[in-house]
Protein backbone atom coordinates (compact mmCIF):
# COMPACT_ATOMS: atom_id res chain seq x y z
CA UNK A 1 0.00 0.00 0.00
CA UNK A 2 1.11 3.60 -0.42
CA UNK A 3 0.81 6.57 1.89
CA UNK A 4 2.15 9.81 0.40
CA UNK A 5 3.73 12.14 2.94
CA UNK A 6 2.38 15.64 2.34
CA UNK A 7 5.65 17.30 1.41
CA UNK A 8 5.79 18.92 -2.00
CA UNK A 9 8.93 18.20 -3.96
CA UNK A 10 8.41 20.50 -6.94
CA UNK A 11 11.10 20.13 -9.58
CA UNK A 12 13.75 18.78 -7.24
CA UNK A 13 16.99 17.27 -8.51
CA UNK A 14 17.89 13.65 -7.76
CA UNK A 15 20.32 14.89 -5.10
CA UNK A 16 17.56 16.93 -3.46
CA UNK A 17 15.23 13.92 -3.51
CA UNK A 18 17.93 11.93 -1.72
CA UNK A 19 18.13 14.64 0.93
CA UNK A 20 14.35 14.56 1.29
CA UNK A 21 14.13 10.81 1.91
CA UNK A 22 17.21 10.89 4.14
CA UNK A 23 15.49 13.40 6.39
CA UNK A 24 12.19 11.52 6.24
CA UNK A 25 13.90 8.38 7.56
CA UNK A 26 14.51 10.08 10.92
CA UNK A 27 10.89 9.29 11.85
CA UNK A 28 11.90 5.61 12.12
CA UNK A 29 14.75 6.29 14.57
CA UNK A 30 13.69 5.81 18.18
CA UNK A 31 15.40 7.73 21.01
CA UNK A 32 17.97 5.72 22.95
CA UNK A 33 18.45 3.17 20.16
CA UNK A 34 21.42 1.98 18.12
CA UNK A 35 20.61 2.49 14.45
CA UNK A 36 21.69 0.24 11.57
CA UNK A 37 23.20 2.40 8.83
CA UNK A 38 23.80 1.36 5.23
CA UNK A 39 26.10 2.68 2.53
CA UNK A 40 25.82 4.95 -0.49
CA UNK A 41 24.98 8.45 -1.65
CA UNK A 42 21.40 8.36 -0.37
CA UNK A 43 22.49 6.97 2.99
CA UNK A 44 25.03 9.78 3.25
CA UNK A 45 22.07 12.18 3.29
CA UNK A 46 20.51 10.13 6.10
CA UNK A 47 23.77 10.18 8.08
CA UNK A 48 23.91 13.96 7.73
CA UNK A 49 20.33 14.19 9.00
CA UNK A 50 21.05 11.71 11.81
CA UNK A 51 23.74 14.04 13.13
CA UNK A 52 20.99 16.51 14.07
CA UNK A 53 19.62 14.01 16.64
CA UNK A 54 22.88 12.32 17.64
CA UNK A 55 22.32 13.41 21.25
CA UNK A 56 19.11 11.34 21.31
CA UNK A 57 20.56 8.00 20.15
CA UNK A 58 23.21 5.62 21.49
CA UNK A 59 24.94 5.35 18.13
CA UNK A 60 25.03 3.25 14.98
CA UNK A 61 26.17 -0.03 13.49
CA UNK A 62 27.71 0.68 10.09
CA UNK A 63 27.79 -1.48 6.96
CA UNK A 64 31.02 -0.08 5.50
CA UNK A 65 34.27 1.69 6.27
CA UNK A 66 33.03 4.70 4.29
CA UNK A 67 29.87 5.06 6.38
CA UNK A 68 31.85 4.52 9.58
CA UNK A 69 34.16 7.41 8.71
CA UNK A 70 31.22 9.70 7.96
CA UNK A 71 29.37 8.75 11.15
CA UNK A 72 32.42 9.31 13.34
CA UNK A 73 33.23 12.62 11.64
CA UNK A 74 29.75 13.83 12.62
CA UNK A 75 30.15 12.71 16.23
CA UNK A 76 27.96 9.60 16.07
CA UNK A 77 29.37 6.63 18.03
CA UNK A 78 29.84 3.47 15.95
CA UNK A 79 29.41 0.00 17.45
CA UNK A 80 30.73 -3.29 16.09
CA UNK A 81 27.97 -5.63 14.92
CA UNK A 82 29.21 -8.23 17.41
CA UNK A 83 28.41 -5.85 20.28
CA UNK A 84 24.72 -5.68 19.37
CA UNK A 85 22.14 -8.44 19.79
CA UNK A 86 19.54 -6.75 17.60
CA UNK A 87 18.61 -3.42 16.05
CA UNK A 88 15.18 -1.84 15.89
CA UNK A 89 15.78 -0.46 12.40
CA UNK A 90 18.22 -0.56 9.49
CA UNK A 91 18.22 2.36 7.04
CA UNK A 92 19.77 1.80 3.62
CA UNK A 93 19.35 2.61 -0.05
CA UNK A 94 18.86 0.32 -3.03
CA UNK A 95 19.99 0.09 -6.62
CA UNK A 96 16.58 -1.39 -7.47
CA UNK A 97 13.48 -2.23 -5.45
CA UNK A 98 10.37 -4.03 -6.67
CA UNK A 99 6.77 -3.80 -5.54
CA UNK A 100 7.29 -6.48 -2.89
CA UNK A 101 10.32 -4.92 -1.17
CA UNK A 102 12.90 -7.18 -2.83
CA UNK A 103 16.04 -5.28 -3.80
CA UNK A 104 19.27 -5.30 -5.74
CA UNK A 105 22.04 -3.76 -3.65
CA UNK A 106 25.80 -3.57 -3.80
CA UNK A 107 26.52 -0.67 -6.11
CA UNK A 108 28.63 0.76 -3.30
CA UNK A 109 30.47 -2.59 -2.89
CA UNK A 110 29.21 -3.10 0.69
CA UNK A 111 26.59 -5.81 0.08
CA UNK A 112 28.00 -8.44 2.46
CA UNK A 113 28.13 -6.15 5.47
CA UNK A 114 24.79 -4.65 4.47
CA UNK A 115 23.18 -8.10 4.67
CA UNK A 116 24.81 -8.74 8.04
CA UNK A 117 23.51 -5.51 9.55
CA UNK A 118 20.10 -5.95 7.91
CA UNK A 119 19.83 -9.40 9.48
CA UNK A 120 20.26 -7.82 12.94
CA UNK A 121 17.37 -5.42 12.41
CA UNK A 122 13.68 -5.87 13.15
CA UNK A 123 12.78 -3.49 10.33
CA UNK A 124 14.48 -2.56 7.04
CA UNK A 125 13.62 0.93 5.81
CA UNK A 126 14.80 1.54 2.25
CA UNK A 127 15.39 5.12 1.11
CA UNK A 128 15.50 5.76 -2.63
CA UNK A 129 14.33 8.00 -5.44
CA UNK A 130 11.56 6.85 -7.76
CA UNK A 131 13.97 5.82 -10.53
CA UNK A 132 14.90 2.79 -8.38
CA UNK A 133 11.38 1.33 -8.34
CA UNK A 134 11.06 -1.46 -10.94
CA UNK A 135 8.59 -4.17 -11.87
CA UNK A 136 11.24 -6.90 -12.18
CA UNK A 137 14.75 -6.87 -10.73
CA UNK A 138 17.68 -7.13 -13.12
CA UNK A 139 17.93 -3.94 -15.13
CA UNK A 140 20.69 -2.72 -12.81
CA UNK A 141 23.86 -4.87 -12.95
CA UNK A 142 23.70 -7.42 -10.14
CA UNK A 143 26.70 -7.19 -7.77
CA UNK A 144 28.08 -10.47 -6.44
CA UNK A 145 30.96 -10.58 -3.96
CA UNK A 146 33.15 -13.62 -4.62
CA UNK A 147 36.44 -15.27 -3.71
CA UNK A 148 38.82 -14.47 -6.60
CA UNK A 149 39.76 -18.07 -7.45
CA UNK A 150 36.10 -18.83 -8.21
CA UNK A 151 35.65 -16.03 -10.76
CA UNK A 152 35.83 -18.15 -13.91
CA UNK A 153 33.48 -20.85 -12.64
CA UNK A 154 30.90 -18.37 -11.33
CA UNK A 155 31.06 -16.41 -14.60
CA UNK A 156 30.19 -19.64 -16.43
CA UNK A 157 27.31 -20.36 -14.07
CA UNK A 158 25.82 -16.92 -14.69
CA UNK A 159 26.24 -17.41 -18.45
CA UNK A 160 24.10 -20.54 -18.16
CA UNK A 161 21.37 -18.32 -16.70
CA UNK A 162 21.69 -15.80 -19.53
CA UNK A 163 23.83 -13.36 -17.57
CA UNK A 164 27.13 -11.70 -18.46
CA UNK A 165 29.49 -11.26 -15.51
CA UNK A 166 32.38 -8.84 -15.41
CA UNK A 167 34.87 -8.19 -12.64
CA UNK A 168 34.36 -4.69 -11.21
CA UNK A 169 37.47 -2.58 -11.64
CA UNK A 170 38.95 0.34 -9.76
CA UNK A 171 41.23 1.93 -12.30
CA UNK A 172 42.81 -0.98 -14.15
CA UNK A 173 42.73 -3.40 -11.20
CA UNK A 174 39.90 -5.42 -9.62
CA UNK A 175 38.12 -3.47 -6.91
CA UNK A 176 38.82 -5.01 -3.50
CA UNK A 177 35.95 -4.95 -1.00
CA UNK A 178 36.18 -4.12 2.70
CA UNK A 179 36.33 -7.91 3.18
CA UNK A 180 39.32 -8.38 0.87
CA UNK A 181 37.32 -10.03 -1.93
CA UNK A 182 36.30 -8.98 -5.47
CA UNK A 183 33.00 -8.19 -7.15
CA UNK A 184 31.28 -9.40 -10.28
CA UNK A 185 28.64 -7.19 -11.90
CA UNK A 186 26.14 -9.29 -13.84
CA UNK A 187 23.96 -7.93 -16.65
CA UNK A 188 21.28 -9.56 -18.79
CA UNK A 189 19.23 -11.04 -15.94
CA UNK A 190 15.50 -10.86 -15.27
CA UNK A 191 14.98 -11.94 -11.68
CA UNK A 192 11.30 -12.87 -11.56
CA UNK A 193 11.63 -14.95 -8.36
CA UNK A 194 14.14 -13.08 -6.17
CA UNK A 195 13.93 -15.49 -3.23
CA UNK A 196 14.65 -18.56 -5.38
CA UNK A 197 17.41 -16.71 -7.23
CA UNK A 198 19.11 -15.60 -4.01
CA UNK A 199 18.88 -19.16 -2.66
CA UNK A 200 20.41 -20.63 -5.83
CA UNK A 201 23.35 -18.26 -6.26
CA UNK A 202 24.19 -18.23 -2.55
CA UNK A 203 24.87 -21.98 -2.79
CA UNK A 204 27.53 -21.67 -5.49
CA UNK A 205 31.03 -22.36 -4.16
CA UNK A 206 33.03 -19.15 -3.98
CA UNK A 207 30.06 -16.79 -3.67
CA UNK A 208 30.37 -14.65 -0.55
CA UNK A 209 27.18 -12.64 -1.06
CA UNK A 210 24.77 -12.09 -3.93
CA UNK A 211 23.27 -8.61 -4.16
CA UNK A 212 19.65 -9.79 -4.23
CA UNK A 213 17.98 -8.87 -0.94
CA UNK A 214 14.92 -11.11 -0.75
CA UNK A 215 15.54 -12.79 2.61
CA UNK A 216 16.49 -9.39 4.05
CA UNK A 217 13.96 -7.41 2.03
CA UNK A 218 12.56 -4.00 2.95
CA UNK A 219 9.42 -3.65 5.04
CA UNK A 220 9.18 0.06 4.22
CA UNK A 221 10.46 2.18 1.33
CA UNK A 222 10.60 5.97 1.48
CA UNK A 223 10.49 6.89 -2.18
CA UNK A 224 11.42 10.37 -3.37
CA UNK A 225 9.14 11.45 -6.22
CA UNK A 226 8.28 14.62 -8.11
CA UNK A 227 5.22 14.88 -5.85
CA UNK A 228 7.03 14.37 -2.56
CA UNK A 229 8.01 11.39 -0.41
CA UNK A 230 5.83 8.29 -0.76
CA UNK A 231 5.83 5.63 1.92
CA UNK A 232 5.55 2.12 0.48
CA UNK A 233 4.91 -0.73 2.90
CA UNK A 234 5.38 -4.42 2.10
Swiss-Prot record:
Q: What class of enzyme is it?
A: isomerase
Q: Which residues form a coiled coil?
A: none
Could you tell me which Pfam families the record lists for this protein? Rib_5-P_isom_A
User: EC annotation?
Assistant: 5.3.1.6
Give the GO molecular function terms: ribose-5-phosphate isomerase activity
Q: Which GO terms describe its cellular component?
A: cytosol
GO terms, biological process: D-ribose metabolic process; pentose-phosphate shunt, non-oxidative branch
Q: Which residues bind substrate?
A: 39-42, 92-95, 105-108, 132
Q: Does the keyword Isomerase apply?
A: yes
List UniProt keywords, sorted A-Z.
Isomerase
Catalytic activity reported: aldehydo-D-ribose 5-phosphate = D-ribulose 5-phosphate
The pathway noted for it is: Carbohydrate degradation; pentose phosphate pathway; D-ribose 5-phosphate from D-ribulose 5-phosphate (non-oxidative stage): step 1/1
* Keyword set includes RNA-binding: no
> Which residues does the entry assign to the active site, renumbered to this chain?
114 (proton acceptor)
The UniProt entry, under PANTHER family, shows: RIBOSE-5-PHOSPHATE ISOMERASE
This molecule's function is given as:
Catalyzes the reversible conversion of ribose-5-phosphate to ribulose 5-phosphate.
Subunit-structure text = Homodimer.
Family statement drawn from the similarity comment of this UniProt entry = Belongs to the ribose 5-phosphate isomerase family.
Protein name listed in UniProt: Ribose-5-phosphate isomerase A
Source organism of this protein record: Albidiferax ferrireducens (strain ATCC BAA-621 / DSM 15236 / T118) (Rhodoferax ferrireducens)
